[in-house]
Amino acid sequence: MSRKIQRKEQILDAALHVIVQNGYHQSRMDDIVSTSGLSKGAIYWYYKSKKDVYLDLVNHWVIRYSNSLLELPKEDISAGKQLNNLFETFFNQFEKDPIVFKALLEFWSLAGRDTEFNIKLEKVTHNFIQYIESIIKKGVESGEFKQVNPNIAAMSIMVVIEGISWFTLFEKNSVSAKEYIETVFEFILSGLLKRIES
C-alpha cells in the first residue's frame, strides 16, 4: 500500500469516528486532525474541506463493499444461496464495523438536505439495487423464484439490509442483529421461492 493511500485511509478512518461522535454539522476539520494524529497541513494536502472528506468517505466504503460483493461466488450456485451469502456479508460487516452502519444513518440524513450527498448516495443505492436485481432475475429465469418484479424485490431487500443500521442506535433490543437477519432472510426467501406442486 502506497504512503498516499495509507494517509488517506488514516484520515477517512478518523473522519468516520468523528461523524459518528459529533454528527456531520458539528464536526470540524480540527476534529479530524486531532483524531487522525496528522498535521492540519497533511489533511488539507488531500482534502480542501470537511465536505470533500465525507464525500470521499462514501466512495471509500462503496469500494470496500463492492470488492466484498465481487468476491462472492456467482457461478454454479443458486440465486437463493447468493442472497444468503449477501445477507451474511452484511451481517459480518456489521459485527466487524458497526460504526459504519451508524455513519450511514448520518449520510442518509444529509442526502435529504444536500444535493451532492443526495447524488452520491442515489448512485450507490442504484448500483446496489442493480446487483440484487441481477440475482432475482437469475432466480426467476432458472425457475427457482416466482415470476416477481425483480426491481421491486431488489428494493425491498435493500430496505431490509439498511434496517441493520438501527441496531447501532439502541444498546438494548428485544432481538439481536443476527436473529433479525436470519428471520427476514427466511421471510424474503419463502416469498420468492416457487412452490412445488405435489
Per-range role (PLM):
Residues I11-I19, F90, I188:
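Short hydrophobic clusters on alpha-helical segments that form packing/core surfaces
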Residues R7-A15, I32, L57, W61, ...:
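Generic hydrophobic, amphipathic alpha-helix propensity
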Residues L72-P73, E88-E95, L104-G112, F187-L192:
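Helix-loop "lid/cap" segments that line or gate small-molecule binding pockets
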Residues Q10, V18-D52, D56-L57:
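Helix-turn-helix
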Residues E71, K96-I99, T115-E141, N151-M155, ...:
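Amphipathic alpha-helical packing segments from all-alpha helical-bundle domains
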Residues N85-N92, I129-K138, V160, E171-S198:
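C-terminal peripheral helix-coil segments that are non-catalytic and often amphipathic
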Residues M1-Q6, I196-S198:
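N-terminal intrinsically disordered/low-complexity leader segments
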Residues D56, L70-V100, A153-I157, K178-I181, ...:
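Hydrophobic alpha-helical connector segments
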